[in-house]
Amino acid sequence: MDQWNRNYRNLPGKKIGVVQGKTPEEIIECYTFMDKHADVDKIAISFDYSLYEQIAPHENKYMSWMLGRAMMLANMSQDIINKNKPHHLLGCGLPQEFALYQDYKWIESVDTSNPIVHGIKGIAYKHYGLQTKESIKLVDLLDVDISNEQLYDINHNINYFRTYVNG
């Protein structure tokens, strides 16, 4: 890692490390490595670790992913998360998950195509969010001609998404 940091530290742009692992111990070990040893500007945490289904078992895997990441972050924020380092959340199981993080000032950014994909598929967010998720990637929808109804749903979803994130 020291050699990698020496060779690539001065490249333009920001460096982001993505936490990997299948157990709480692996996640914590990888997170700690990213925080203390990897010369990264930001730490990213994914939405679909298999671990989440063990942390928060639910018949709906997307609910497990949402609640599992929220529970993991709540536990890690007590004494593991470096609140002085920016964090990024990769994707989401369900978009309303981001409402759970409004007090986590260390989360600097999130990314998801969820509002767009669901709008294209004609699915408008409800006030509570969604209960399921379309499993199609935005890249597979790039050539779709967007109707006025789909555009309305996309904008509707983006507005709801903003309220989940910002309150």
Describe the role of every protein-language-model region.
Residues 36-38, 72-88, 94-167:
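Alpha/beta catalytic cores of nucleotide-metabolism and tRNA/nucleoside-modifying enzymes
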Residues 1-100, 104-110:
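Eukaryote-skewed repeat-based solenoidal scaffolds used as protein-protein interaction platforms
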